[in-house]
């Protein structure tokens, strides 16, 4: 594997210099393959180290991996290369997710600059989240097309994301701010929706859960550190510097993936191999299975696959619908806290903007503690069970992880709401956020694993629908959060009754994983989509 050669930078250098990355050994292998196919007209046989490509009924020579140890297969890359790609995805996810919360410390200044109320400015947060809810329905499926791959989607969409921060920082009206924020969320979405697929490209199933956890920490770290970084910019300069800083962070991520992010999509790598074979031999029959399958898709079929099916699954499947609502609530609480924390810690404890940003670190600490415990659970329980079953296990088994987590969310909300008063030390409500982080982390890990195992054939559609559902819910919460807390009070505990309302809703959700654990198999057996 030529690591740098397979990056966007390497491909550009190759294109400009007109150098072919084919070598004499590969050419020799291709010609030997062709001679064997022509002489034997056989398929799936081997001679020495050379695999004869299968010839289908239409005369296409199907290009696959040479064998299980093919070095171009991302699963066979060296450890250092996999770790570099994992870092790329985690940092890219952080760089986009930080864009949601980095916005919040400057809301008051933006109100003064634009002469508008709170809700119109908060729409900048709402539309950003809504943008990365809709984006995956359009951009993520493009990464599954063999001719496109994942790498170029990451680079091009992030380039647009970086450029959009310039008019956002320079604008002085909602007419500029709101469309730019929506577009930024839209073009930042591939990292959030496709990052997990990239990790699945390079890590074996028994190692993937560990590295998915690191990716989750990157996703949590963005919103958690955003208020601190944005607050520092507001204090040091102005609200405009929130977006200049976001441009710098995402610009650095763009440089990293431009130089150090190779293509990981199996379909695209094999497509490029088939393309090289066609170029070397002049034989246009060299094709990949994915290439042939995608060539038969019409625009209507593609729309059904990417837009309609995720919505149908989200509404018609009881398992998917119930988990989407639950995950949506948990996800929305995080964005609601972007309004609740300033109300509590600024009005009651008189924190500065910087100090208020530090409050969110409690969530990150809770996530890191849970991560360490979850790793032990994976190593001692989950992975051995997976290996012992040969990968054939009931999906409901993973829901056990969520059982304690279902109680953590309401505990956190009641604790946070009623401890947030001047007579109670400020550290007490912050400690409650550790329970939220732990509950959210475990719930997301178990429920996403359950959805993936229950709908293996339609996992992309299920995850796209979940992303749309939870992000749409989260986008709406900041719009009514301040009014809810201000109107419910009481004045000595301003977030108490608002948190209590959410805590009661969270209590109503507690039975969901238990019900699915007991009756999930029956529900799946009645579904035409589930395994």
Swiss-Prot record:
Subcellular location as annotated: Membrane
Membrane topology: Multi-pass membrane protein
UniProt keyword annotations, A-Z: Membrane, Transmembrane, Transmembrane helix, Transport
Gene Ontology CC annotations of this record: Golgi apparatus; plasma membrane
Top-level taxonomic group: Eukaryota
GO molecular function, one term: fluconazole transmembrane transporter activity
Transmembrane regions listed in the UniProt entry: 83-103, 119-139, 158-178, 182-202, 214-234, 241-261, 325-345, 358-378, 398-418, 424-444, 495-515
InterPro entries with a match to the protein in the record: MFS, MFS_dom, MFS_trans_sf
Family of the protein in this entry: Belongs to the major facilitator superfamily. CAR1 family.
Record-given protein name: Caffeine resistance protein 5
